């Protein structure tokens, strides 16, 4: 059983610095590693002892390393048997007294979590773009079938229920592509903080693609259920997208907690001001006015679209 998944801080793999400080010695293992059976270079996250410069206390913190199989001590298990993405080589990787040069630390010692988040953000962003292609392929298959298939003397495309399914598929595709372009635009402009957008894009894309593939099979009926059509494979392959790169459940918690944290920071000065409200009317009044406007359905800032009901 895995010791860590969504809980990245529970990593057990360790890397201890050598006595002369020239390298780290890595021991432990990782499971479910993509390309683990033949990869020559790995990005490995491991617990390392880090001394706090202020207190002098030593604590374990995650550090990212670039590990090469040629270092020695790197082995792997047999490929895993999976529900989907079977063409992807997924295997356990084991590390036994692997000597990693100190120059192979990614970022800084103890800064592995930041590196992991950067990698995950990129992966989540790319998911929206990749799954847009999957959805488009499914929509084409469902549409072609609806145009050609005749039942009860009518083409499937002429039934309102089928039209609704096709419309729903295209709506989700459009939204997924729009989110992918938005996140890509933020990245191109050099934005450093796009983790919320990447998380939301990953959730929406993975769940929309699953829905579109499922509805495609439904439109095709028995034909879609057969392996020859290929959509059962698409559905199996899509299931992992709601799990890896951060499960959708964890990402929902992340989005909610980040939003609450942001609101908490906004309310912090108000909390302090309320201890002496008459002396801090300048701080309290704008917030109170904004809350009153919200209750009345008025925008917080000027808008041409608002009109009293």
Where are the language model's segments positioned?
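Cysteine-centered functional microenvironments
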Residues: 1-2, 10-12, 27-30, 195
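Active-site beta-strand/loop segments that form the cofactor-binding cradle
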Residues: 1-4, 29-31, 35-37, 147, ...
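Structured loops at beta-to-helix junctions and adjacent beta-edge loops in soluble globular domains
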Residues: 2, 47, 68-70, 79, ...
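Short Gly/Pro-enriched turn/cap motifs at secondary-structure boundaries
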Residues: 2-6, 32-35, 55-56, 82-89
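Short beta-strand or tight-loop elements
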Residues: 9-11, 40, 72, 162
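Flavin-dependent oxidoreductase catalytic core characteristic
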Residues: 10, 16-23, 59-64, 87-94, ...
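Short structured motifs
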Residues: 11, 77-80
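A short core secondary-structure module
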Residues: 23-76
């Amino acid at each position: 059983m895995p010791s860590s998944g969504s809980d990245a801080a529970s990593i057990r793999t360790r890397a201890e610095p050598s006595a002369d400080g020239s390298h780290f010695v890595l021991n432990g293992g990782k499971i479910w590693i993509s390309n683990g059976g033949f990869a020559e270079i790995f990005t490995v996250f491991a617990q390392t002892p880090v001394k706090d410069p202020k207190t002098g206390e030593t604590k374990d913190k995650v550090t990212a390393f670039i590990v090469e199989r040629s270092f020695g001590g790197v082995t792997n298990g047999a490929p895993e048997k999976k529900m989907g993405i079977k063409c992807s080589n997924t295997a356990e990787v084991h590390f036994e007294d692997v000597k990693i040069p100190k120059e192979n630390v990614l970022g800084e010692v103890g800064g592995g979590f930041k590196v992991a988040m950067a990698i995950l953000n990129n992966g989540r962003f790319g998911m929206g773009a990749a799954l847009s292609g999957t959805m488009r392929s499914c929509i084409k298959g469902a549409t072609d079938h609806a145009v050609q298939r005749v039942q009860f003397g009518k083409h499937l495309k002429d039934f309102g229920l089928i039209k609704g399914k096709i419309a729903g598929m295209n709506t989700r595709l459009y939204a997924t592509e729009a989110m992918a372009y938005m996140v890509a635009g933020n990245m191109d402009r050099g934005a450093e903080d796009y983790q919320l957008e990447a998380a939301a894009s990953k959730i929406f894309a993975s769940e929309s693609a699953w829905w579109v593939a499922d509805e495609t099979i439904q439109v095709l009926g028995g034909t879609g259920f057969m392996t020859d059509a290929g959509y059962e494979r698409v559905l199996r392959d899509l299931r992992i997208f709601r799990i890896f790169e951060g499960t959708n459940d964890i990402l929902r918690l992340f989005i909610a907690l980040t939003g609450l944290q942001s609101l908490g920071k906004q309310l912090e000065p108000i909390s302090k001001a309320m201890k002496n409200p008459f002396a801090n009317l300048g701080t309290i009044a704008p917030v109170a006015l904004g809350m009153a406007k919200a209750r009345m359905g008025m925008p917080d800032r000027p808008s041409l679209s608002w009109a009293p009901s």
